[in-house]
Amino acid sequence: MHIWVDADACPAVIKDILFRAAQRWQIPLTLVANQMLRTPPSALIRAVQVPRGFDVADAHIATHAVAGDLVITADIPLAADVLAKGALALNPRGERYSPDTIRERLSLRDMMEELRASGVDTGGPAAFSQADRKAFANQLDALLARQAAQASRP
């Protein structure tokens, strides 16, 4: 397993949780962004800076993620792409994307985009909360524990 992070919009507190998880579980972690990122000194953790542009970081992750990897993203089309490859996808609020729910999420996203394009103020996401941080940490820990248990089976 490799953890890929769509890091441009990922909250710093989530990155910190991921840094600790990579060390604890000894799993490689790559943050992908169109800007320089600070990472702790670790052979497991690296940052990739991609050129600025629409969905360039997403395209990098979609190209490099493979079945069994974990992708952290709030971008629903990216989540759909990596799920189609057999990877896992989790958003920074702790919601796991699944093949069963991704079509509905894409449809809702497209509808909201159409409303915004027609001038309707749809508001934005709620502020990132302590409950979101906790939900992410719990979901991440459960996913990594499950992965470790599967890897240790003969």
Curated annotation (Swiss-Prot):
Family per UniProt? Answer: Belongs to the UPF0178 family.
Organism of origin: Bordetella avium (strain 197N)
InterPro entries given for it? UPF0178
Q: Where along the sequence do coiled-coil regions lie? A: none
Q: Which HAMAP family match?
A: UPF0178 (MF_00489)
Output the NCBIfam families linked to this UniProt entry: PRK00124.1 (NF001095)
Q: What is this protein called?
A: UPF0178 protein BAV3236
Q: Report which superkingdom the organism of origin falls in.
A: Bacteria
